[in-house]
């Protein structure tokens, strides 16, 4: 009996099993059970390609991360590599939308799903997303394959232009998939993802205005870009609920109902004054969770949770003001790769908090990310530890 149980378990090793949807929107960590091969095999895009001898890795995992601090950055290996992942989606996801989000690949990548080419991403730093819905085999095995070239001298195919910031003497080249990957499953009426690269969508935007620091009040705005992929009109109610750091609901409000036509993209808005606010500040990373939801005929069909803080800033008389107080800016310039020995830039979130928290402990209130955008994890980390971030325009 023991051998039969072991055989049953081994049958499922190597194929990610994604559980049935448990809410109106599901976001799955898509980092586990990838396969990596260093070298170029054009046939690796095919579904039936034999990858059983490839290296098993968990993302984020650049192929050359173990070279970090062992080699000088100008000596980091650059080559072509392939990543593949086998996964299944439950059959009851068939009438849903499925998106994949890569927080970043370096330098250029070709993406395939079930042998079909779905797109090219040439950036090296920023996130990209793809709509997998037309290609998914529900209840069956699916294969995603990604061919990546991290050549130091990589040039855009359309223009023959090099990346301005890709320099052997500066920006450490950890090639492949050095950042997280997520799978999103939504209703066909949904709030878009903030993935302008390829998807051309902007997602949810939460901000505050009319901030009154002394009375701890502000008007909080929520905006969601939504899309209706049903074949009929949808009358949509837009609701917003704000939760404090401890998870307590402090305000609920909603916008006017809107009719969204089939295939139409629209922006829904709502705002309300909130009192008793804690304002985000240096060393005080107070964050709220704002849930924006879509309702049709009294039923919630989509919900997105956004973590954010509220602060008041002003520039005048040669000074910077934060929450109505003058603040002298001082801090560090940090390479966006921000690497650690043996793992490169692909560190867990707690290590990002430790690294960024050290700057706050050292009396810094500002980090200037150098030349290219940092990854999402560092942005969120600085929000948590209370560190102001700056990145110069025109160099990203």
Predicted feature residues:
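Accessory beta-strand-rich segments of carbohydrate-active enzymes
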Residues: 28-30, 40, 78-200, 230, ...
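Surface beta-strand/loop "capping" patches
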Residues: 188-230
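Short acidic/polar inter-strand loop motif in beta-rich domains
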Residues: 149-156, 295-301, 324
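Conserved, mostly hydrophobic/aromatic
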Residues: 34, 115, 181, 224, ...
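Signal that preferentially marks extracellular ectodomain short beta-strand elements
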Residues: 130-135, 269-285
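Beta-strand-rich binding/interaction modules
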Residues: 113, 215-258, 266-268
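Bacterial Sec-dependent N-terminal signal peptides
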Residues: 1-24
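Active-site mouth of glycoside hydrolases
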Residues: 125-129, 138, 155, 164, ...
């Amino acid at each position: 009996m023991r051998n039969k149980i072991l055989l049953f378990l081994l049958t499922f090793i190597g194929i990610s099993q994604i559980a049935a949807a448990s809410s109106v929107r599901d976001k799955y960590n898509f980092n586990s059970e990838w396969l990596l091969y260093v070298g170029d095999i054009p046939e690796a895009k095919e579904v039936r390609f034999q990858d059983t001898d490839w290296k098993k890795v968990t993302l984020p995992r650049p192929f050359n991360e173990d070279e970090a601090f062992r080699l000088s950055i100008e000596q980091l290996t650059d080559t072509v590599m392939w990543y593949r992942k086998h996964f299944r989606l439950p059959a009851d996801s068939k009438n849903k939308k499925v998106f994949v989000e890569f927080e970043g690949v370096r330098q250029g990548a070709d993406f395939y799903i079930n042998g079909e080419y779905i797109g090219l991403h040439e950036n090296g730093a920023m996130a990209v997303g793809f709509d997998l819905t037309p290609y998914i085999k529900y209840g069956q095995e699916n294969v995603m394959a990604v061919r990546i070239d991290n050549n130091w001298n990589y040039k855009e195919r359309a223009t023959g232009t090099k990346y301005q910031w890709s320099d052997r003497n500066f920006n450490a080249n950890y090639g492949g998939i050095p950042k997280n990957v997520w799978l999103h499953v939504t209703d066909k009426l949904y709030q878009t993802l903030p993935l302008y690269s390829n998807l051309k969508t902007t997602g949810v935007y939460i901000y505050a205005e009319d901030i009154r620091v002394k009375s701890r009040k502000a008007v909080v705005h929520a905006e969601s870009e939504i899309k209706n992929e049903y074949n009929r009109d949808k009358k949509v109610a837009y609701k917003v609920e704000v939760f404090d750091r401890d998870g307590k609901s402090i305000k609920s409000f909603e916008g006017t109902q809107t009719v969204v036509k089939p295939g139409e993209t629209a922006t829904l808005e709502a705002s309300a004054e909130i009192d008793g606010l804690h304002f985000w500040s240096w060393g005080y990373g107070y964050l709220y969770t704002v849930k924006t939801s879509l309702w049709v005929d009294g039923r919630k069909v989509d919900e997105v949770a956004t973590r954010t803080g509220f602060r008041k800033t002003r520039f005048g008389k040669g000074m910077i003001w934060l929450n109505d107080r003058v603040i002298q800016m001082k801090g560090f310039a940090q390479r966006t790769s921000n690497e650690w020995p043996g793992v490169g830039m692909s560190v867990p979130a707690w290590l990002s908090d430790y690294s960024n928290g050290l700057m706050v402990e050292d009396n810094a209130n500002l980090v200037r990310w150098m030349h290219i955008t940092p990854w999402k994890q560092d942005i969120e980390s600085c929000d948590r530890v209370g560190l102001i971030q700056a990145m110069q325009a025109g160099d990203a």
